[in-house]
């Protein structure tokens, strides 16, 4: 299973084509739109989210609410396009038009963004050609793709949720998720302005975000994704590129501004002894093989153990600052303050939604690689058989 996305931040639309979905999978625009709305929310979003109302249009591969087995095409329109039709138009400029009047060219790259190196790589003197595609706006359609993947996982008894565990050093009490189902965690998260399970920490996060906004600065944080209902043995120890944790790490780091990833106890493992890290194996007739703890985050040897998968990612502060850092004009080579584009003071809550969906996509992809089927009922039967096998092993 694979997908491609196309579209610029201020272009007419974002488009994706998904190939490899089994037929007979229930999909509705309503469910995808719910996830798109979550991505637009969270305290700290900028003015762009006041302009856009992201909704998906399913234009191919689905009929009467079910996939056909052919490629699925999704489109999310950019409402702001009407203000950028001349600036971002695909057709060559007319001879009597002064390019400087409409292009809004950028020659002062922002530190920490793709602007300068992207311009070098693709030969763009106008750095807008870089930032329009490197913008996190592209994650809109990745959430739509992940929402489709979640629909598939839901049919297989696998559920997923993400929440914010830290913003600018303010840490949530993550023990509050213990003993709760994914649905229970989601209900708490969706009602919170920072998508956090800890209301005390969330209130402090809100204050910190507001302070950063007033200062023209930005702040980052940490998000956690929990996957419940995973069968054991998904992934492989045989080759490096089939390890499930490696694939999930790559997915997390593919999100704009994400710079680190960990599983289970994560980097805390470096400060513990082996007896305090590894999960003891137990067996019961009711559950089969399970673990006494879940310090490794549901992964051993590049494979799922059947315990909940727990993966965290760290997001750096957004590089677009309203009090910009020092940069250099690539045309004059003179020092200047970096260019300023509309941006968020903190996008960690929104990024947690993106993380949830890229992880969902990766897990769905690995499952379909391991249990390939052209139609959903056959896939469900294979998963059920696999679960019975691992339970009785």
Swiss-Prot record:
Q: How is the cofactor bound?
A: Reduced FMN (FMNH(2)).
Leading EC class: lyase
Known cofactor(s): FMNH2
Under InterPro entries, the record lists: Chorismate_synth, Chorismate_synth_AroC_sf, Chorismate_synthase_CS
- GO BP terms, alphabetized: amino acid biosynthetic process; aromatic amino acid family biosynthetic process; chorismate biosynthetic process
- Record has Lyase as a keyword: yes
Q: Which GO terms describe its molecular function?
A: chorismate synthase activity; FMN binding
E.C. no: 4.2.3.5
Q: Where does NADP(+) bind?
A: 39, 45
GO cellular component entries: cytosol
Cross-referenced SUPFAM superfamilies, in alphabetical order? Chorismate synthase, AroC
Q: Could you tell me which pathway this protein works in?
A: Metabolic intermediate biosynthesis; chorismate biosynthesis; chorismate from D-erythrose 4-phosphate and phosphoenolpyruvate: step 7/7
Which keywords does this Swiss-Prot/TrEMBL entry list? Amino-acid biosynthesis, Aromatic amino acid biosynthesis, FAD, Flavoprotein, FMN, Lyase, NADP
Q: Give yes or no: UniProt keyword Flavoprotein.
A: yes
Q: Which PROSITE patterns match?
A: CHORISMATE_SYNTHASE_1 (PS00787), CHORISMATE_SYNTHASE_2 (PS00788), CHORISMATE_SYNTHASE_3 (PS00789)
What's the catalysed reaction? Answer: 5-O-(1-carboxyvinyl)-3-phosphoshikimate = chorismate + phosphate
The residues that hold FMN are 133-135, 256-257, 301, 316-320, 342
Task: Provide the function of this protein.
Answer: This reaction introduces a second double bond into the aromatic ring system.
Q: Which family does it belong to?
A: Belongs to the chorismate synthase family.
Quaternary structure, from the entry: Homotetramer.
This protein is called what?
Chorismate synthase
Species per Swiss-Prot/TrEMBL record: Lysinibacillus sphaericus (strain C3-41)
The record's gene field reads aroC
């Amino acid at each position: 299973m694979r997908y491609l996305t196309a579209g610029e931040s201020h272009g007419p639309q974002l488009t994706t084509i998904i190939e490899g979905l089994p037929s007979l999978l229930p999909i509705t625009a309503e469910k995808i739109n719910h996830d798109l709305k979550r991505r637009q929310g969270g305290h700290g979003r900028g003015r762009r989210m006041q302009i856009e109302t992201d909704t998906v249009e399913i234009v191919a591969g689905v009929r009467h609410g079910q996939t056909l087995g052919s490629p699925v095409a999704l489109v999310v329109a950019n409402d702001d396009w009407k203000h950028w039709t001349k600036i971002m138009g695909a057709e060559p400029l007319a001879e009597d038009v002064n390019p400087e009047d409409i292009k809004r060219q950028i020659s002062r790259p922002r530190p920490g963004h793709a602007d300068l190196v992207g311009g070098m790589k693709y030969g763009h003197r106008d750095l807008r050609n870089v930032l329009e595609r490197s913008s996190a706006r592209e994650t809109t359609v990745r959430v739509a793709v992940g929402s489709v993947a979640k629909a598939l996982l839901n049919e297989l008894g696998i559920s997923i949720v993400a929440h914010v565990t830290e913003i600018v050093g303010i840490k949530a009490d993550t023990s509050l998720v213990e003993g709760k189902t994914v649905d229970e965690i989601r209900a708490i998260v969706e009602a919170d302005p920072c998508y956090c399970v800890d209301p005390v920490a969330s209130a402090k996060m809100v204050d910190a975000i507001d302070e950063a906004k007033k200062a023209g600065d930005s702040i980052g944080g940490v998000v956690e994704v929990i996957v419940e209902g995973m069968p054991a043995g998904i992934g492989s120890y045989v080759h490096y590129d089939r390890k499930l944790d490696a694939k999930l790490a790559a997915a997390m780091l593919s999100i704009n501004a994400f710079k680190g990833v960990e599983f289970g106890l994560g980097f805390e493992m470096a400060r513990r002894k082996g007896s305090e890290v590894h999960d003891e194996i137990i067996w019961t007739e009711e559950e089969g093989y399970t673990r006494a703890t879940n310090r490794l985050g549901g992964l051993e040897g590049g494979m799922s153990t059947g315990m909940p998968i727990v993966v965290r990612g760290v997001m750096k502060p957004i590089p677009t600052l309203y009090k910009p850092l020092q940069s250099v004009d690539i045309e004059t080579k003179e020092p200047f303050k970096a260019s300023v584009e509309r941006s968020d003071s903190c996008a960690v809550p929104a990024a947690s939604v993106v993380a949830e969906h890229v992880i969902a996509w990766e897990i769905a992809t690995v499952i379909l690689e391991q249990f390939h089927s052209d139609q959903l009922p056959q896939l469900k039967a294979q998963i059920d058989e696999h679960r019975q096998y691992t339970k009785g092993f």
